[in-house]
């Protein structure tokens, strides 16, 4: 197997998992903070050069790139041949993995550093405009928006999905659970500091 990892110098490295030997490198135009994704026989990685890059997993050769209007900070979510990128340009973009063409885009109303969570034909993610969005991908529109009724704070954390809930951390020092269908608040849990990490759900529990 092969491990793919980006660095702050803007280089994506392919390393053999067995012995750690370098297989290839690919230089982008700026730092890489997103995790690479392998989908459809293609390595996808976003960068601060405002691009989503698609590379050959064996050679590192560029297959295509898609230029957005802002930095691509978060990891893409891939489903049914589409890479969903919620980026710093305030757009949720669906990019075809096969050829790098944009299928559609939906305005988010704010930039995001979170990776979209996909389930049931919807995408869920928070923004730096203090909102969490539930986006209907078939209708290509925002189904609901959540904003805390008293506090204003960004959602940097990527969401986890389970038991009909969207669970993510907020910079208000709380973990928030929202109803996935309606976006209404289900519960919150207070922590001692802002929650930028992404929750994981297993065995009926949330770990963060």
Model-derived segments and spans:
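Conserved catalytic cores of soluble enzyme domains
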Residues: 174, 208
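Extracytoplasmic beta-rich repeat domains
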Residues: 7-9, 24-39, 48-51, 62-79, ...
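Short loop/turn segments that connect beta-strands within beta-propeller blades
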Residues: 16-20, 56-60, 96-100, 136-140, ...
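Short loop/beta submotifs within extracellular cysteine-rich repeat domains
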Residues: 12, 22-23, 175, 185
